Amino acid sequence: MPEFLYSSIFGALTQHVQARFDAASKLHKQLFDNVIFERFLDWDTPTIGLDFEEIIGQYNITVAAPTIGDNSKEAILGTEGLETVKERILNHAVTLPMTIQDYRKVLQILDSKSLPDKAKTEQLIKLMWGSTTTVVSSVLAKLDILFLRPLSNEGIVELDDNINPEGGVRGTINFNQPAENIASSKTPWTDANLETVDCFEDVQDIIDAAQDKTVFGKILCAPSRISYMCRSKKIKQMIWGTDKSAKIVQLKDLNAYMQENSYPVFEPIRRQVRIQKGKLRVPYTPWNEKNMVFIPDGKLGIVKNAWANNELKQETGVAYSNYGRIRVSQWGVGETQGSNGVEFTKAESLSLPVITEMNGIYTLKTQQ
């Protein structure tokens, strides 16, 4: 067996990581809950090189601000301009060092005389899998941000300190949603207007405006927008009639009405991620809850991606596995490298979600 399949402390058990990934793929099982971009985007064929000049030339987008440069081990600090950014690719990378407590726990398991080999193996795999899911989930969360934010924010995502606190070029990725695809509600959807706002009229106006251009399959929105519609007086009257307007309206009632009348159904988007800011993990919701997004059926784009450096040239002493186009590396650092003994788990993806169907996507701004 080639040496690169093994890490310093888990040894051949690292093969279980790829085995789990493969088994889940074969069964079409979702290993990571609440990942949204994979439902709406397909991974493009990986390339050796991927830069913004190619993306800008092929798609109607303006791109700035990668997470880190393709030649960088650490985050790029500063505020370089758009022209320098065009020469870089997005590298979303997270490395998790094993705590000394967990490291000692592994050594205790390995040294235990009372534990049978099977129990040792199960405990080691559990520890190893925990680190793997943490780093892979972090990369998936960043890709969800880069998809959900522009989808719900008129095609624009700002790479600022809120979502990219580790540094990097500041700026925007703009998928240039057509101005005619964006409309505002006639009355702001606020609590003060619950008795007068006509939510369905706003929805109907969007559907009518797009009828010669696209057919919508769903209306994506934050749970708060669905709750607002269900509480509004005119929606209650529309669903139950004037004489029963005091009756509670739920999402299932609203969607039953939409289906009966051949309208797109509402789908709540629930996604919160945690952004590491120094020692703090700050919750962040990428979806702009003020906007409702009307989308056609089918995929909305692709995830452009490139081979990771260690896919092109593997290192000895490192165990590798792949979750789709996310590359996972596991390795140990010992005394010869100036360490008391630490195990690292890293996930990375050189990629960018690209919304290609923006011409068929419409936005209803419910508040300013």
Where are the predicted features?
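Ordered core of a single globular domain
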Residues: 196-262
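Sequence/fold signature of self-assembling virion shell proteins
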Residues: 236-368
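Assembly/oligomerization interface modules of large self-assembling protein complexes
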Residues: 38-113
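A structural signal for short, well-ordered beta-strand segments and their strand-loop junctions
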Residues: 49-51, 218-222, 265-268
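Surface-exposed cleft-lining segments at the edges of enzyme active sites
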Residues: 185-195
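Long, contiguous amphipathic alpha-helices that act as assembly "spine/axial" helices in icosahedral shell
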Residues: 87-178, 198-224, 341-349
